[in-house]
Structures are given as C-alpha cells and as structure tokens.
Amino acid sequence: MPNRLIVLDQNKLREDRAPEVVHALQNEPNTHFVLPDIAFIEMTKNADHRERTLRGSLRLLAQYPNRVHVAKGLQDCFKSELFTLESSANRLTLREHRDNLRRLLRTVAGGDEGVSDLQRLIEDPDNHYSTLADQYFDDLANKNRLGGVIDALKKALPESTLKDLRAKRLNRTERVEIVYQRAPRLLAGLFKGRGVPEGKAWSFQKKKPMILREYYSMLLLAIDWISAGGFENAAPKTITNDLIDHEYVITATCFDGLITGEKRMIDAYNDLRNLLSRPSYPTAKPNIMN
C-alpha cells in the first residue's frame, strides 16, 4: 500500500490537541506527515521561547522520525515557477531538509544525533529565521496585500454580484464558481506583464502550478471578506493569520490531505480541491492576453 502524505497544521502538533494524529502514528504505518516550511517559521518566530516551542511542537512526531517530511515554502515555489514556467506542485518535498528534520526529531526524542541542528535553530546565527519571521509576520504589509486582491476583485465583478456577496445570497458553490471564472484572467495580467507568450502561459496553467493555487486561494479569501464585511477595520494580525493558514491549505492540495483544528481551513481546502479537479480555464482555451 502506498504511503499517504498528510499536511499537519502547526496547531495540531501538540498531543492533547491531535488524537487523530496519535491514532495514525500508532495504527497506520502508511500514513506519513508533512510539515510545510511555514510551520518552522511559526515555531521559531519568538527567539525568547524558540527552544521550548520547537521541543513542544516536535515531541509528538519525535518517536516516528522516518514518517515525517518537509515541504518547500510557497515563495520559493513562486520564484522557481515564474523563472522556469514549470510547476512545482509535484516536487514539494525537500530531501535535505527532511534528513535534517529527522535528525532533529531524534534529538527531541532523547538522542544526540541532531543536537547541533537544534542548537543552530535556537541560536539562528545568521538571523535566517528572524528575517523570515519579519517578512511573513509583517501584519500591515499582509493586510495591504490582501486588500489589493479585494480591490481588484471588486473592480472585476458586476455590482449585482457584489451585492449578492454582501447580502450573503451566494452559497459556497457559487463563490467557488466566481473564483474559477476570474483567477485565469487575473493571472493572465501577470504573464502579460512578464512578456510570456500566450501559448506558454496556457501550457503552464494546465499544469496546476503553485501560483495558480495561490490565486485561487487569495480570491477565495477575498470573497470571504467581501461577504463578511469589516475588512477595513480588521486588525492586521487577523489578516496575517488568514494568510498563514492558507499556506498550509495550498501546500496540502499537493498531498493527500490536511489535519487542522480550523473548520474554515478545511472548507478552503475542499474548495481548492474542487477548483483543481476542473480544467484550468472555464473554456477550452480563451484568448487570455486580451
């Protein structure tokens, strides 16, 4: 039986919060777990509590190091895809990082194989994790980023659709359809600005790359905020949490599932799987560059 690779939300890395993870570890040897790069950024963001957070978060998995994998960060995927026009979606696991993590897990379990790896994470001598945390947890920048997507979507949608969203007259299926119709058009603007020929842009999107998944995810989130209202007055940290959650969701669409305690993340995951099960364009091959 092939292995199942399940993405774990960082909030499920504590034993008292994750009975389903404990059950899988003890009874389902073909179930493996994937930690996205963002999980380590979350674990290391607070320098004063870094060791305690790392040990506490990794203790649950420490007895099963050979069933744990690491997934590439989304920003690295986007850079690679835009440079090569090749999808990263089927090449997310990182062998070198996986081996480092497994040594670290053995150390957390009481061994000494990865002591130097753990110490390097804790001390962060080159400020690698501190720099990443500053980038990912820039709350104001994150709110501005999502606000830009919301503004673009408002301009693209008919006023009647916006009214239906605000009045909560559209169900989840209808919201997903809006994303399906709009994402390729918005992504086309990026390709056009980079001078990508239409045929290459079409072929690239057919591969369901990470950047298409990002556009789907951001539009789903934008629609949720348009419908709920209150974005302008929302605390920037709330938006950061939304975007961090969606990193887990997007990553999980490349594997076999997601374990999280957040229903809205499960809903977003199911919406993305729905979108990815369909052709990349609503029609056979529209002229996306016009």
Task: Spell out what each predicted region is.
Residues P2-C254, R264-N290:
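Active-site-proximal, substrate-binding regions of enzyme catalytic domains
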Residues G261:
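Conserved residues at the C-terminal ends of beta-strands
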